[in-house]
Structure formats: structure tokens, C-alpha cells
């Protein structure tokens, strides 16, 4: 009976909606945290991360709306553009600003803006190959032609490589200090490990799952782990042990 089938799928639907809502709230709160840091210190990488996290929140909100109310063309385009392309590249750009330095990387901001604008035009104008399914988790593979999918692949793989590589490089650099490593250095090592693990969770979730519940769950878990790593980088927290006698 259709009624019984609908009831059987209800727990999975509710779970997916809950995880998508949680991912939206966590990423939005994460963005507010980086915005607060940027307002206080005016560092370029924190502004880039703020923009990226609000883009992540927009993608999570689209996931939330799509799972809860049914997918439509505009909701899927927002989800795909912000989640698969723009937020990863902008996060990676922020990491380059931090690790390489604003002086060298800042001139490339306009390249990022131009590529982002190009991606927006492509995703918003690309014809849909088939009707957007109202249920489940639509994918670019079934709905878009080659160009939007290539943009998403390059952005996701390249951005994740920069994020994980930057975190691992920081851990190795701090680890080499040996006995000279401070409590703050150790905290930063754990923070970067958490960030790397969170990015890997997000990447694996996006690649491995095509059902809304596990995808939303890994999205929520991944951004939460990255947020935890970010909180560990707080200079006030890192400096706390040094104030003890």
C-alpha cells in the first residue's frame, strides 16, 4: 500500500532533514565565528573562509529544502553551485592566503572572482538533461552536461587537495620542532588534523553516497569536525596554557 510505503520511508526522511538542518546551522555558526575574527583582525584568509562558509551554509540549506519539501530546478542549482564548486575553491583560496601569504596570493583574488562568476553563469544557464526528481538526492551526473560536472570535479578535487595538503603540511612543520614544540603548537597540530579529517569526511560523503540520509549525515559530521578544528586554532585558547605558572 502506498500509505504504508510512505510511513516506512518517513524515519529516513526525518533523519536526513535533521542532519541537513544541523549542517546548515553549524556552517552558518562557523561562518559567524570566522566573520568575528575577520572584524577583529582584518586578515584576508579569514574573510575568504567567511565567504566560503556562508556558501557552504547556502548549499546545506538547499539540501535541507530539497529533502524536506521536494527538489526543484532552482534548489538543485543552488545546492550544486554553492556546495560542489564555489565553497571548496574559496576555502582553498583562504588556505593559500594563510600559508603562502596575502602579498603573493591577494592579486589572484580577481581570478577567483572571475572563475566564480563563470561557474555561476554555467550552472545557472546549463540546461537540465532530465526533470529534477522531487525525492532522493539528485546528482550532476544525471541532470547536467559535461561542463558543470567538470567544473565541480576540478573544484572539489583541487580544493580538497589544497585544504588537506595545507593541514598536513602544518602538522609536519610543527611536529619537526620536537622538544621546542609548545603546548600551543600541539594544540594547532590537533586542530589541523581535525580539519584534514573533516575535509576527508566531506569528500568521501560527496563521492560515496547518493542517498539523502548518509549524504546529509556525512555533511553534518564533516563540517562539525572542521569547525572543532577551527575552534582549536583560537589564539586565546592556544595561549591559555602559557599563562599558567
What are these regions (language model features)?
Residues 40-53, 106-111, 184-195, 215:
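Membrane-interfacial loop-to-transmembrane alpha-helix junctions, especially the N-terminal start
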Residues 72-82, 138-139, 213-221:
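Non-cytosolic membrane-interface motifs at loop->transmembrane helix junctions
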Residues 164-174, 186-245:
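C-terminal transmembrane-bundle signature of multipass membrane proteins
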